[in-house]
Amino acid sequence: MDALSETLRVVRLVGAIFINARFTAPWCYQSPRADTVAPVLEPGAERVVIFHLITEGECYVEMANEPPVRLVAGDAIVFPQGDAHRMTSQPGLPPATGGRLDRVLARRPRQLDYGGGGPATRLVCGYLACDARLAGMLLTGLPSLVRVNVRGSNAGAWLEASVRYALAEARSPRPGGAGVLSKLAEVLFIEVLRLYMNEQSEGRTGWLAGVGDRVVGAALKAMHKDPAHAWTLDELARTASSSRSVLAERFQQLVGSSPMQYLTQWRMLLAANLLSRSNAPLASIAEDVGYQTDTAFSRAFRREYGAPPAAWRRSQSMRVQA
């Protein structure tokens, strides 16, 4: 399993909501910062990632201190940092009264249909809540706006057909419909990340850039495949068919940490995932993430999370119950 797939297996993407929007020019729709609507999407959510898919027509997206970006049918845009933005038929329009995301989410069904009667644009809006630390690692280095066109990918036709199915589910909810919408939103989001990786240009940094790099990607794959292994820089360099110095420099440049620091971070993320999702004893979790003693594991976990594993597990349990 590659590093992206392994990370997505651990990252919890929950609370997916689809909004089916039809606008007719002129129109302008304001989306506030994601953290302001997080309580509506998923109570207690640590991080919210927002994305839109243009299914018909064209429009612009506007963000503070950034030039407007023109979007066409098939374009998918993701806001990794949850920035406020405007979707509009042309730059410079004020948002319409009632055209705010936090107000729309209070309606059932979650649909938008308004504008001035001109050319129509259709959008699908997806919102996913996820673990802050895992999402932080996955999305680090990404720009405030990621844009790809899904129609150019092999999965494009399937994705658009799936979105149409999701919209039908939203109009006529059936048992299990919420789960279907959540999975479809997750798949669409993952496909956007994959397309972005394939389109990466020179000079990009971040975890996804590291996954796509020949040297760093090989080291990441090895650590994610067997996190309990007693990896050394020498062994990782051999795995990546590289020298120690090249691997260390390239890893720091793209991921922002040394390979050994990253290994510890990944192990602690896995441990936190096991602590919050299972009743496994601490000794078993420690062994699963590469620690021979509870003491060494507890010390490393406290450095990362500010509390011993047992206390952190109890706090997570109390948070869920609340």
Regions found by a protein language model. Give the residues of each.
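Basic/polar phosphate-binding segments, predominantly the helix-turn-helix DNA-binding elements
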Residues: 187, 191-197, 218-269, 286-311
